[in-house]
């Protein structure tokens, strides 16, 4: 039997009757009772999504925006403090390795949030280009 990683909210999801599914190395809640009821609740009130499993890559320094723009398909230089941008990182052959969100927290401080299974891969992937 595979041992999955669990978010800090796993016990709460269990108490609420979640049905779980594998997501990379994580076991994540897929649904609770009825999908239509969940949909209506989100449309009429609010919905929460547990992001505990997502990766976090911190990039700091005077050239952080230029470095991230080099690594991703988006130009992050004009991104204003307190804003975020959805982007992607591509493999050498042009295929998409992952989609991610980058937050500019300060002028020289960024938080990159990749999908859970790709955080380690992305952390080690940027390499010099010819």
Describe each model-derived feature in a short phrase:
Residues 1-90, 95-97:
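Acidic, proline/glycine-enriched N-terminal capping motif
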Residues 62, 115-119:
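Helix N-cap motif at beta-to-alpha junctions
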Residues 123-130:
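Conserved small/polar residues in nucleotide/adenosyl-binding loops
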Residues 67, 121-122:
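Phosphate- and divalent-cation-binding pockets in alpha/beta enzyme and binding domains
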Residues 101-102:
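Glycine-rich, Trp-frequent "lid" loop and neighboring beta-strands that shape
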